[in-house]
UniProtKB/Swiss-Prot annotation:
It comes from Arabidopsis thaliana. It is found in: Golgi apparatus membrane; Endoplasmic reticulum membrane. GO terms for cellular component: endoplasmic reticulum membrane; Golgi apparatus; Golgi cis cisterna; Golgi membrane. Residues 40-102 form the t-SNARE coiled-coil homology domain. One of its GO terms (biological process) is positive regulation of response to salt stress. Belongs to the BET1 family. Required for vesicular transport from the ER to the Golgi complex. Functions as a SNARE associated with ER-derived vesicles. It is a single-pass type IV membrane protein. Keywords: Coiled coil, Endoplasmic reticulum, ER-Golgi transport, Golgi apparatus, Membrane, Protein transport, Transmembrane, Transmembrane helix, Transport. The chain crosses the membrane at residues 111-131. CDD domains: SNARE_Qc. This is Bet1-like protein At1g29060.
C-alpha cells in the first residue's frame, strides 16, 4: 500500500486522493490549499441513509439513557434493600441477645430438655426400625 502513495499521493493509483466509490471527487479551489467536494447526483440516496443513521443514533442514545436510568433505579433499590437487611440483622441480633439473657436469668434448662427429648425420640425410632426390619 505504501508503494501506491509515492506516484500520485493516492491509494487509488492515479485517481484523486479523496475519490471514493460513492461518487466523491475533489478539485482545487483557486490555487489554495482548500478542497471542494462534489457529490454526484446519482448518489443522492446517501442523504436518506444519513437521515436513517441519525434516527438510529438517536434511538441508541435514548436506549442508552434508559439503561442508565434503569441502572440508577436498580442501584437505589439495592441500597434500600441493603439498609433494610442491616436493620433486620440488628433486630435479630438484639432479640437473640435478649433471649440469651432471659435463658440465663431463668436458670431453667428448657432447651436441654428439648434436645434430650429429640435424641430419645430418634433412638426409639432407630431401635424400632431395627426390630421390625427383616
Amino acid at each position: 500500500m505504501a508503494s501506491n502513495r509515492g506516484a500520485g499521493g493516492s491509494l487509488y493509483g492515479g485517481a484523486d486522493p479523496y475519490r471514493s466509490r460513492e461518487g466523491l471527487s475533489t478539485r482545487n479551489a483557486s490555487g489554495s490549499e482548500e478542497i471542494q467536494l462534489r457529490i454526484d447526483p446519482m448518489h443522492s440516496d446517501l442523504d436518506d441513509e444519513i437521515l436513517g443513521l441519525h434516527g438510529q443514533v438517536r434511538q441508541l442514545k435514548n436506549i442508552a439513557q434508559e439503561i442508565g436510568s434503569e441502572a440508577k433505579s436498580q442501584r437505589d433499590f439495592l441500597d434500600e434493600l441493603q439498609m433494610t437487611l442491616i436493620r433486620a440483622q440488628a433486630g435479630v441480633k438484639n432479640n437473640i441477645r435478649k433471649l440469651n439473657l432471659s435463658i440465663i436469668r431463668s436458670g431453667n434448662n428448657h432447651i436441654m430438655h428439648v434436645v434430650l427429648f429429640a435424641l430419645l425420640l430418634f433412638f426409639i425410632l432407630y431401635m424400632w426400625s431395627k426390630m421390625f426390619k427383616r
